[in-house]
Amino acid sequence: MGEVKKRSLFSWLLFDLANTVYAFIIPGLYFSVWLVSEKGWTDQQLGLATSSAMIIVAILGPWVGKKSDSSEGKKKLLLTMTLLCIISTFLLGTFSVEISVLLFVISLIGFNLGSVVYDALIVSVSNNDNRGKISGLGVAFGYTGSLIGFGVATLLQNNGYSYEEIFKSVALLFLIFSLPAFFFIDEKIVSSKKIKTSILNSLNIVIKSWKHSRQYEGLTRFLVGRFFYADAINTLISGLLAVYLVEEVGLTPADSQNILALAIVVSIIGGYIFGKLADIYGPRKLILTSICCWIISLSLAIIATEFNQLWLIYVTGVLGGFNIGGIFAVDRVFMTRLSPEEHLGEFYGLYSTVGRFATILGPILWGLIVNTLSLSRNVAMGSLIILLVISFMIIKDVSDKERF
């Protein structure tokens, strides 16, 4: 690999590190705890805030993806969405709680639309023979970013800094680690066409993209299956896992952070190992294995709280962490096998739409069970297991042979 290629790959990996700092610290941990435990908002209100952002992302994702397939390329769009996320994150806590929730929603929109473009850039830094390994490295770098963000945030909190100052530090970390991507990624432009389409036409693009996806064997079925496992996983990492550990399990915020830190460490290993194995055995087997491990992990969490076996929470953290790194390393590879390169941005838009609609349904379902029906969070956790079983049944028959 030449010097420019190495620089391009490293810059792409650093961006995964940068945006995972945000994903783990803001929606995954500190903002959710700040909102529920410090400001008195409910799980349902947090879920509705997250879901409102995901509705917008689900509608705009295919438009952004299709736009990124044009001759204008992906990096300009990535820069725009990244700055939207960074600026709104920097301002969290500066104004009223309501304004902060609005800024949180905006930051989620920028982050998730940027991820559509970033994921599609994998074809610029990899080939068919090493794409699983590269995707796994991206996940490993990403969760290394979580460790960096967690370390900085914990250091600041232990030294008396406020949540608001932690939010600002995350925004600055995102900015610093994302900068190389905009200068050094050697983007592979597949299309020579300019795509002129209004953002107001987004819903029409979503419909056309879904119809288009049916032309490629297994793609639509995989996306539907992904909806269900992403629903379960994204519901937890949207912040409700941190709330679950504190409010249901009874851990202190410090103890819950230690478990999440442990999960991050093993997710780095999981992402790399699953990525390497995907190049050998194919992504389908690895995704199915990961789904099974998630079912076991969530079942152990329920057993741990119902029978007061808190040591099992650490087992859950290790198993869940290993597999969250694994499943997100492998499903990117699955997408590239099912999609032609010239439409990769468009179909990653659908991939994002599926993930975001999953993030809409999951928190709403969780809030309905916990706040409306007044059932325990363990019942909500059980509902996520059902979603994982459905996902397994859908994906098990999708072929992952290389097509393009």
Q: Which positions does each model-derived feature cover?
A:
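Intracellular juxtamembrane helix-capping segments at the cytosolic ends
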Residues: 113-126, 326-339
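C-terminal ends and interior cores of transmembrane alpha-helices
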Residues: 79-97, 293-307
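Central cavity-lining transmembrane alpha-helices of secondary-active solute carriers
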Residues: 48-66, 261-273
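Glycine-rich segments within core transmembrane alpha-helices of 12-TM secondary carriers
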Residues: 133-154, 352-362
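Helix-loop boundary and gating motifs at the non-cytosolic
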Residues: 2-54, 218-259
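Juxtamembrane intracellular "pre-TM" segments in multi-pass secondary transporters
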Residues: 1-9, 188-224
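A membrane-interface helix-boundary motif in multi-pass transporters
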Residues: 156-172, 368-388
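Helix-to-loop junctions at the C-terminal end of transmembrane segments
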Residues: 60-73, 270-283, 370
